[in-house]
Amino acid sequence: MKSMHRGISTMRNFAVCVFTVILWLGCAVAKADTVLDWNEIAVNTAIANGQSPFAQARFAAIAQLAVFEAVNSITGDYQPYLGTIQAPRGASVDAAAIQAAYRVLSTYFPKSVTTLDTQRANSLAAIADGQAKQDGIKTGDDAGKAMIKLRTDDGSSPAQFKTPGAPLAGEWEATPSCPTVGGVQVGAFFHWQHVMPFGIASAEAFLLDPPPALKSSEYAKAYNEVKTVGSHNSTERSQDRSNVATFYAASSPTQVFNQAARQIAQAQGRSISENARALALINMAISDAAVAAFGTKYHYATWRPETAVHNADVDDNARTDQDSSWEPLIVAPCFPAYPSNHGSLSGGGAEVLRRVYGEGGHAITITNPAFPTLVYHYTNFNQILADISDARVYG
């Protein structure tokens, strides 16, 4: 059950593959407020529109790749992702970044267009009127439209579900949060393993080893840890770990690691070109990690902790005791347990951040408006991953 660390480790390797899609960082000196501002707008818009963590990652990747392609078509600093956008000489990089993000977000989130129009107008007002501004807007619009076209029919919709088979020890069964289709509770996001990746070949390329066997001591150790500290009424879980579990259950990897990236980019004075590229890579990694994680999840179809605890009498392991009344602190999501989605997406995002900015020496503050009293400070990415790992065990 405690498969979080395995997911993070594998997603490190996965993130390296994504990272090689575009060339290594070069040197530049310009400031990049527009790229960072519209990254925050992109993430917040997806959240405000009620998107799942996996859809958030996909939309952020599309928006950031559009921004990167728009900026890079003007600066020429890196190998392009699309390579089809032609920018006039002297086009405004800031206008291009603003319009690229706006085009993607306004297309996917029509309910937010009024807010996005205001944000776009405010951002563009800071740029002097003239041909450079107009050329930048045209370049950004072209990049946004090109990314939208590329991702049409990418497998993210329509939703497909998995009907559970006959109950077997260790096999995933529907939990209370699962939707009902045709009178049967089904597994959600079954189709996400087939979403077209941004940088990797396929989910199959990152299939993990199977989870620990039910009879193993490793399984029993993880089982008893989760049963003890992860229950709804656990007396062994501190308030701090309860807070971490609740906070990170509501804070998606896209939200967390883009927040960290913006803070570090500002602190390090990264250029607009560097920021556009880094944010594209980070969100490619997070999104593709979701594809890979769902591939492994539905390949092994491992039962959730509450199913495991309720049915410990059939797991053939003398070191696990059944408790038919056990409930987790956090309601289980409706898909198999192994590997942790949160761990996989976080591991992918953190590894790219690590390679772009370095592991430590940072001043990172992670917040979520839904929990105004909870503020987490970190100096390196391993600290963030440790809290996320704990969150999936304690919650």
Question: Where are the regions that the model predicts?
Answer:
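A periodicity- and composition-biased signal for non-globular, repetitive helical segments
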Residues: 8, 18-19, 348
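Acidic/polar surface patches and capping/hinge elements
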Residues: 31-395
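N-terminal secretory signal peptides that target proteins for export/translocation
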Residues: 1-12
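Glycine-centered signal
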Residues: 3, 27-29
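Extreme N-terminus of proteins, especially the signal/transit-peptide cleavage junction
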Residues: 9, 29-32
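Bacterial N-terminal signal peptides
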Residues: 15-26
